[in-house]
Amino acid sequence: MHQLLSDQIVECGLSDFYEVKQQYIEGKNGSQFSFAGLKHNARQLKSFEGVDICWCEEADAISKHSWDILIPTIRKPESEIWVSYNPQLIEDVTHQRFVVNPPASAKVVKIGWQDNPCFPEVLRGEMEHLKAS
């Protein structure tokens, strides 16, 4: 995710606005993207209090233990947790928590590759090849 955002900052001509560091990306307006792994560092999430938006990418791999730490940490009024992943198993903790039995306040939006206006042609070709084989 860090590399993707860094590349987009350059591609969109925003390098003068954002300062890209190894652990975070900071905007001149005080906005900040912070990056943390959940698998081995779930306890460090407690330092993320005050976050407005927490985006969990590849969230299918997030354990119940990590969710149990993260969810109460993101408690600023009007804060949001965004979850994106490719479902593997219906029994996966993330899928159960946010799709099968979502919180009343959840907004669940199912998105596929066809909804991505930037979906690369090379991936489309690979996908079609895999379907055919």
Predicted stretch roles:
Residues 1-133:
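Phosphate/NTP-binding elements of NTP-utilizing enzymes
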